[in-house]
């Protein structure tokens, strides 16, 4: 990683006029890891490799569009004045929640059409998305975005961060809270917990790994978002905090309701819809 005046160079490779940014490289790395993990788990749950690959091919472009559209909508005053910036995602400005919503819609439609349990497929995907998000936040780090309020060098040193991380948090003449790191760490912790218990007999019904992911991520995101300085707002309210509250209580409420109202298949049973149709 080259340095620009003590700051990490956001460009990984320059090929003539083509610049390959670390932001894209890091996000792509997270996606690749997520795909590998999802394929491994899908085999155990009687979901075909082709189904996973097809889902990814459909979901990724819509997730990218959804993530960008979400951001543009809530920053419309800027993009209305600068329409050429709308497609320049390498400048940053994609919202995770928008991407997750779009990808989930694609997953549900595909599963209904191909006799797959949407709950099961989303269970398989959820922890892999979580680790991809954790990795992707380091793309924000390279772009010096998604940071928090002003802090001191002394505070950052108490976190025992490498010097290159601390130096990157010097933005516009002031040290900033590394909120990208807080969210990344929260996601890694959630990933480890879910991966450690998801194969235990009787722990999860289908759909509950997904709901665990939603509740875990939304809970952490609510507090991290409160520290950020680049939040999207509706009036005085932070959009992501509102959505985090809705998702957290919605996920917990749906978990309780499903347990009370339905006889649910166990996660370890895998996909039974396709065999039932045959």
Curated annotation (Swiss-Prot):
Q: In which pathway does it act?
A: Protein modification; lipoprotein biosynthesis (diacylglyceryl transfer)
InterPro entries associated with the record: Lgt
What's a GO cellular component annotated to this UniProt protein?
Answer: plasma membrane
Highest taxon listed in the record's lineage: Bacteria
> Example GO biological process term?
lipoprotein biosynthetic process
User: Listed GO molecular functions?
Assistant: phosphatidylglycerol-prolipoprotein diacylglyceryl transferase activity
Q: Where does a 1,2-diacyl-sn-glycero-3-phospho-(1'-sn-glycerol) bind?
A: 137
| Entry's transmembrane regions | 18-38, 55-75, 89-109, 207-227, 237-257
Look up and give the membrane topology term. Multi-pass membrane protein
Q: Where in the cell is it found?
A: Cell membrane
**Keywords of this protein's UniProt record, alphabetized?**
Cell membrane, Membrane, Transferase, Transmembrane, Transmembrane helix
User: What EC number is given for this enzyme?
Assistant: 2.5.1.145
Q: What class of enzyme is it?
A: transferase
Q: Which family does it belong to?
A: Belongs to the Lgt family.
Indicate what this protein is called per its UniProt record.
Answer: Phosphatidylglycerol--prolipoprotein diacylglyceryl transferase
Gene that this sequence comes from: lgt
């Amino acid at each position: 990683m080259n340095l620009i005046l003590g700051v990490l160079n956001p460009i990984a490779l320059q090929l003539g006029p083509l610049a390959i940014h670390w932001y894209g490289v890091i996000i792509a790395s997270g996606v690749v890891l997520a795909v590998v993990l999802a394929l491994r788990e899908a085999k155990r749950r009687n979901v075909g490799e082709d189904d996973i690959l097809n889902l990814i091919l459909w979901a990724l472009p819509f997730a990218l569009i959804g993530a960008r559209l979400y951001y543009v909508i809530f920053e419309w005053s800027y993009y209305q004045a600068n329409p050429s910036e709308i497609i320049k995602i390498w400048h940053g400005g994609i919202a995770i929640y928008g991407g997750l919503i779009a990808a989930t819609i694609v997953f549900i439609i595909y599963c209904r059409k191909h006799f797959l349990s949407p709950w099961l497929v989303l269970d398989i995907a959820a922890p892999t998305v979580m680790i991809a998000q954790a990795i992707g936040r380091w793309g924000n780090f390279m772009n010096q975005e998604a940071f928090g309020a002003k802090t001191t060098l002394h505070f950052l040193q108490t976190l025992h961060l490498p010097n290159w991380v601390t130096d990157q948090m010097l933005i516009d003449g002031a040290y900033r809270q590394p909120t990208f790191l807080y969210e990344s760490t929260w996601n890694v912790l959630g990933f480890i917990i879910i991966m450690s218990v998801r194969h235990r007999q009787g722990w999860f019904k289908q759909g509950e790994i997904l709901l665990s992911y939603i509740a875990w991520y939304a809970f952490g995101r609510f507090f991290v978002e409160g520290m950020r300085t680049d939040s999207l707002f509706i009036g005085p309210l932070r959009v992501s905090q509102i959505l985090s509250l809705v998702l957290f209580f919605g996920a917990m409420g749906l978990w309780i309701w499903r347990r009370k109202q339905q006889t649910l298949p166990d996660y370890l049973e895998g996909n039974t819809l396709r065999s039932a149709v045959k």
